[in-house]
From Swiss-Prot:
Positions with a binding annotation for L-glutamate: 98, 117, 182, 211
Side of membrane Cytoplasmic, spans: 299-303, 354-432
Name recorded for this polypeptide: Glutamate-gated chloride channel alpha
First-listed, main subcellular location of the protein, grouped into a coarse class: membrane
Annotated source species: Caenorhabditis elegans
Signal peptide: 1-20
Gene Ontology MF term list: extracellularly glutamate-gated chloride channel activity; glutamate binding; identical protein binding; transmembrane signaling receptor activity
Quaternary structure, from the entry: Pentamer. Homooligomer, forms functional heterooligomers with glc-2.
Family: Belongs to the ligand-gated ion channel (TC 1.A.9) family. Glutamate-gated chloride channel (TC 1.A.9.4) subfamily.
SUPFAM superfamilies to which the protein is assigned, alphabetical: Neurotransmitter-gated ion-channel transmembrane pore, Nicotinic receptor ligand binding domain-like
Extracellular topological domain residue ranges: 21-275, 326-332, 455-461
Protein keywords: Cell membrane, Chloride, Disulfide bond, Glycoprotein, Ion channel, Ion transport, Membrane, Postsynaptic cell membrane, Signal, Synapse, Transmembrane, Transmembrane helix, Transport
Compartments where found: Postsynaptic cell membrane; Cell membrane
Length: 461
């Protein structure tokens, strides 16, 4: 029995010795291969730790290995990607418009926040065929550098990229070499505004995008075929003083002395909200004009009341006009708001002039009436002398005089008619009576002409 056990141990030791010898032989072969190549790889270390297993080379499917392969194969990010036909690199663009804020009429600019997405093909970055066990795309970090279009915004005044919590940038490389670049940026853009119809105007603001250095021989920008411009949900109703009514995408290729440059343009149509100006400007100014007409019902002798009312309404209208103009830039043309304010001030000023005319006529009539009274007083003695020379028999024929009884209602009607006729014959009172009807009619006609001319830009009715 003991002899059998000893034999088994001897056989086992021989087998272990043979395996150890084989492992040493394989290790020497591995080191010799590594020394020939001049490198020591992770696969060699794995063979040393597991000498009894034959290593099998695994496909490079991890992102790190793919990136290491891409950026150690002579890739030069300073050179634009080559194309099959030698033409320009086609850059497909679409944008997500997130916010529009701070529409400044004085400086003619507005602020916008958007996500810009650009896509192009760089075959130097392709790393395999889809479906061979490799990922569909890899994401680059900030440290990696690849060729990118030199995109800029021609009508931009200020701009910055968002970096909280990390830079809001996405660079995705697909296995066929398609590159997707996405970035979130905020822009302050110039927007030339035409204020002829202010505050019922509709403005057209744009976002231009072009290449700064590459001409159309090198880069061609194209809008994405489907959904080139996307709007964030609720954007149209989030503007405080405007309403986003329409958007469109066009091309704006420019020709300069350095070449022809591809350009894309997004046009944003903004309609000003009229309700604010209706409550803050048009209704108060109408009330001021109507208040100025109250002086037509004052007695012509109420000079302090009529002057105070006219001057107060005129000064109030002037202050309102100054407040509106302080929110607008100085322009060389007449705006709709200028026509309205000018007409209202004209009506108020004419009401004040009407009182001056009435007062002048009344004073002139007073002087004439006083002179006529003095002449009548001077003629009374002469009439009395003539009366004494008339025969008394003329006044004794009382039987020929007939009396007509009048009731109170007929007497009042007669007196009112006499008083109205007297007022109409009084020129100063006649001017007040005409003004009471003429001013409202003229203001109503002006409103019809005004709203038919300027109201068509903004649906009011």
């Amino acid at each position: 029995m003991a002899t059998w056990i000893v034999g088994k141990l001897i056989i086992a030791s021989l087998i272990l010795g043979i395996q150890a010898q084989q492992a040493r032989t394989k290790s020497q072969d591995i080191f010799e291969d590594d020394n020939d190549n001049g490198t020591t790889t992770l696969e060699s270390l794995a063979r040393l730790t597991s000498p009894i297993h034959i290593p099998i080379e695994q496909p490079q499917t991890s992102d790190s290995k793919i990136l290491a392969h891409l950026f150690t194969s002579g890739y030069d990010f300073r050179v634009r990607p080559p194309t099959d036909n030698g033409g320009p690199v086609v850059v497909s663009v679409n944008m997500l418009l997130r916010t529009i804020s701070k529409i400044d009429v004085v400086n003619m600019e507005y602020s916008a926040q958007l996500t810009l997405r650009e896509s192009w093909i760089d075959k130097r970055l392709s790393y395999g065929v889809k479906g061979d066990g490799q990922p569909d795309f890899v994401i680059l970090t900030v440290g990696h550098q690849i060729w990118m279009p030199d995109t800029f915004f021609p009508n931009e005044k200020q701009a910055y990229k968002h970096t909280i919590d990390k830079p809001n940038v996405l660079i995705r490389i697909h296995n066929d070499g398609t590159v997707l670049y996405s970035v979130r940026i905020s822009l302050v853009l110039s927007c030339p505004m035409y204020l002829q119809y202010y505050p019922m105007d509709v403005q057209q603001c744009s976002i231009d995008l072009a290449s700064y250095a590459y001409t159309t021989k090198d880069i061609e920008y194209l809008w994405k075929e489907h959904s080139p411009l996307q709007l964030k949900v609720g954007l149209s109703s989030s503007l405080p003083s405007f309403q986003l009514t329409n958007t469109s995408t066009t091309y704006c290729t420019s020709v300069t002395n350095t070449g022809i440059y591809s350009c894309l343009r997004t046009t944003i149509q903004l309609k000003r909200e009229f309700s604010f100006y209706l409550l803050q400007l048009y209704i108060p100014s109408c009330m001021l004009v109507i208040v100025s007409w109250v002086s037509f019902w004052f007695d012509r002798t109420a000079i302090p009341a009529r002057v105070t009312l006219g001057v107060t309404t005129l000064l109030t209208m002037t202050a309102q006009s100054a407040g509106i103009n302080s929110q607008l830039p100085p322009v060389s043309y007449i705006k709709a708001i200028d026509v309205w304010i000018g007409a209202c001030m004209t009506f108020i000023f004419c009401a004040l002039l009407e009182f001056a005319l009435v007062n002048h006529i009344a004073n002139k009539q007073g002087v004439e009436r006083k002179a006529r009274t003095e002449r009548e007083k001077a003629e009374i003695p002469l009439l009395q002398n003539l009366h004494n020379d008339v025969p008394t028999k003329v006044f004794n024929q009382e039987e020929k005089v007939r009396t007509v009884p009048l009731n109170r209602r007929q007497m009042n009607s007669f007196l009112n008619l006499l008083e109205t006729k007297t007022e109409w014959n009084d020129i100063s009172k006649r001017v007040d009576l005409i003004s009471r009807a003429l001013f409202p009619v003229l203001f109503f006609v002006f409103n019809i002409l005004y709203w038919s001319r300027f109201g068509q830009q903004n649906v009011l009715f």
